A protein has these predicted regions:
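N-terminal leader/linker segments that precede catalytic domains of diphosphate-processing enzymes
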Residues: 1-74, 79-133, 142, 163-200
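Acidic, glycine-rich loop-and-strand cores that form catalytic or ligand-binding grooves
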Residues: 135-146, 150-152
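Short, flexible helix/strand-to-coil boundary loops that buttress conserved ligand/catalytic motifs
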Residues: 139, 157, 195
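A mid-sequence, solvent-exposed acidic-amphipathic segment
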Residues: 153-161
Length: 200
């Protein structure tokens, strides 16, 4: 799959996002409880594409002492504050978690909302950032930041399906193996959605 940034811009801006649409793929791929959809909390994440010669995606690894999603690999993001839209929330959270100034983010487009098994309806916002920023993880929330080649994470052959038990039920979810920490669950599902959109 090509990771040319102009091609990505063109594909995403041409894509017709359906607000509130439950994506084809979720972190409970085959068994998401659709009865929960009305009670989901709005949230947003920034999907930061770093504009290197070979573009990369920026991920955070959450601190092990966090109350939610401890130690997991994630995009920077969180719930919407009152009066915020998804883009503003994604930029605010990215600045809080990684010291990324919003002025340096070229917002390309939001993609389909992503419903998580933990009760959130997440809007992923794809943005392009320059490669020379002095980013820094928020000490209380983020253990580290790392990059993964965009071509790698968009490669469907790296999108593994696994099963495991959660809250007494067997769940099916995506995993994208990586040396700095496996990308799995909701974050991997959002990457799979992005790959699907770019190849439609």
């Amino acid at each position: 799959m090509s990771s040319d940034l102009d091609w990505i811009r063109a594909r995403l801006r041409r894509y017709e996002r359906i607000p509130g649409h439950l994506p084809q793929f979720g972190d409970d791929i085959d068994n998401f409880d659709t009865e929960l959809l009305g009670a989901l909390t709005p949230a947003a994440v920034l999907v930061p594409v770093i504009a290197r010669r070979e573009p990369t995606l920026l991920f955070t690894k959450r601190n092990a002492n966090m109350r939610r999603h401890a130690g997991q690999v994630a995009f920077p993001g969180g719930r919407l504050d009152p009066g915020e839209d998804a883009v503003r929330a994604a930029l605010r959270e990215a600045e809080e978690e990684t010291a990324l100034p919003p002025v340096h983010v070229e917002v390309v487009a939001p993609i389909d909302d992503y419903a998580t098994g933990t009760g959130f309806r997440v809007t992923p916002v794809v943005g392009i950032i320059p490669p020379d920023l002095a980013l820094m993880p928020h000490e209380a929330a983020v253990e580290s930041l790392f990059e993964v080649p965009l071509d790698y994470v968009l490669d469907a052959s790296k999108h593994e399906r696994r099963t495991g038990e959660w809250k007494g039920r067997e769940r099916t979810f995506y995993v994208i193996p990586w040396r700095d920490g496996d990308i799995w669950g909701a974050t991997a599902g959002m990457v799979v959605n992005l790959a699907r959109i770019l190849t439609q």
